[in-house]
Amino acid sequence: MPTDNDPILVTCGLPYANGPAHIGHLRTYVPADIFVRALRRMGHDVLFICGSDAHGTPIVVNAESRGMSPRELVEFYHKHFEDVFRSINVRFDYFGCTDDPSNHHRTQEIVRALMERGHVYPKEIELAYCPRCERFLPDRYVEGICPYCGVPARGDECDQGCGRHLEPGEIKDAVCKVCGTRAEYRKQTHYFFRLSAFREFLLDYLQRLGGTASARNYALEWVRQELKDWCITRNMSWGVKFPGSEDLVVYVWVDAPIGYISFTEEWCKAHGVPWERYWRGKSRIIHFIGGDIVYHHCIFWPAMLEGAGYTLPSDVVASGMLKIDDKKFSKSRGYVVWVKDDYLDQGLEPDYLRYYLASYTSHTKEVNFSWKILQEKVNTELVGAFGNFLNRAVTFAVKNFDGKVPEGELDPEVMKRIEMSVGDVSSSLMEYEFKRASDAVLSLADYANTYFQSHEPWKLIRSDRRAAGSVLRNCLQMVKAMIILMEPFMPSRMAVAWKQLGMESLDDIQFRDAVQPIPEGHPLGTPKILFSRIEDSTVKRLEEIFRERVRRAEGAGEKVKEKPVIPFDQFKALDLRVGTVLEAERIKGSDKLLRLIVDIGEKRQIVAGIAKMYKPEELVGRQVVVVANLEPVKIFGVESRGMLLAADINGDAVLLKPDKEVPAGCGIR
């Protein structure tokens, strides 16, 4: 196991080079950057790695629709993300791309190692094939029905229902996404990773995994069920070639996380450091990811690393999801805030957004982004508390003590309070509690404001100049501490604040320096307003941009995809009934599924993928429409004997119900 003296490698889930950055992306990258900056302020040896995810069917489909090559599309968005990260002060030590030669090489090396150790085997399977396009349909090239929960799904994932990863050939009623033709099924040989053989290893490993409990518990729920072997090849030309085959590439979720290793190699090569220090030694590897890719990082990835003989991640830190104005995040419905167009290009301070994302709520909980809440947090917490105290303290010292730190004793109570704040911030960040850490800095600012007000230096200066000097030296000591502790959250603004104390650079400053006495007679810089208020007119303008996007999305709508005509007798075979929900509860380990007991003339247990739209308590007593004669299926280990009918509004489920209450079990015709 790694110790406190071992090197630390921090990675972020790779941004997919298929579209622009939105603030949901930053929910992963900003906290990771804060964490890395804090580690360095605590004296740790840390390397910060990321890069663009360049492969997979969505990129190929998007590139084809634009009349460009996948590589051209990837290069465009790779640069876009580099620019956004630079602007938002996320500073990776290395930002690579999974289509770089080094990642092709490392991926093939790992796959060969897995094959040599007997963890990969060939198997003939049936795959969706489009007779019109004359090609096999991997992943996002095909849509159909999830075989586990019966809702519409993508070829590789049941994104609207049970959340399962779908293996090639599993999806039912497959349709080509390109031309809409019903797919045929044809046999072909593919390669599988023996994931099932790693079940006991994963159960033990996940019990020890650090990071957020949400990631660990979610993965454990999956592993406790049956683990199926994992198809790791696809019929595509874009990607990393599978060793020994010209027709197959490795699945994107094989080569994407291997990017963490190849990017580390590239940085190490440039700095004369052996890459094995991080991936074959006693290092601490910490993955920051979005909550939607826990399955891949906590199950597939550690099993591959164990199978190939690499160092395992010690922590997986999964963020909560994002809402926009209390609405579910949705690009198609317009509920999105683009980092460049909607924030940076509007002239807003990057550090404000960093502070918002870190301080709004606990890292694992859902963040609601709103321009009004941003305004309130900036104007109240940053301008009113933090900035107000800093400006008053520095301005008073400059005006009344010749622009220098006055002479005077440092109050033991003040120093104790600073020391407590350093401890609170450090421990909170090491536990990935970013809000708790930022709250600790704001608490010190509140204490400092109270100290300044209660000691009334503006009166004291007239009667006891030395006593007033002592008050101001203590205030400036607290300013110093606040800047050092807030730097990981707002690096640009704190660099400006640091110069107001007459200091040059924060680069080599440690958290422990917050309690080092500020020297008497030290020349101060020029006081300036650190934070500017966000005015009502700005909020109004930004909200109008957002509302216009929603209006355009609603006006455009999505064309309804017509399905093949079916015989009336096929429709008559459905047993549709009105049911009344008697019980509802969340299914442990899933953020999408609810377990319901529904009265349909008899009590039925039904699993429904509606947890993101409905709270369990809202459903009890509600009438619903049920398909009652479906074969029972197990979803997330829970038997489901029926399915609720719902409208699909851009991915949101809206339950159907009769326009007036009818007896439970009433048939529908």
Swiss-Prot record:
Protein name: Methionine--tRNA ligase
Compartment annotation: Cytoplasm
Record InterPro entries: Anticodon_Met, Met-tRNA-synth_bsu_C, Met-tRNA_ligase_1, Met-tRNA_synth, Methionyl/Leucyl_tRNA_Synth, MetRS_core, MetRS_Zn, NA-bd_OB-fold
GO biological process terms held by the UniProt record: methionyl-tRNA aminoacylation
Gene behind the chain: metG
High-level lineage: Archaea, Methanobacteriati, Methanobacteriota, Stenosarchaea group, Methanomicrobia
SUPFAM superfamilies reported for this sequence: Anticodon-binding domain of a subclass of class I aminoacyl-tRNA synthetases (SSF47323), Methionyl-tRNA synthetase (MetRS), Zn-domain (SSF57770), Nucleic acid-binding proteins (SSF50249), Nucleotidylyl transferase (SSF52374)
Similarity section: Belongs to the class-I aminoacyl-tRNA synthetase family. MetG type 1 subfamily.
Class of this enzyme: ligase
Function: Is required not only for elongation of protein synthesis but also for the initiation of all mRNA translation through initiator tRNA(fMet) aminoacylation.
EC numbers, comma separated: 6.1.1.10
Positions occupied by motif 'KMSKS' region: 328-332
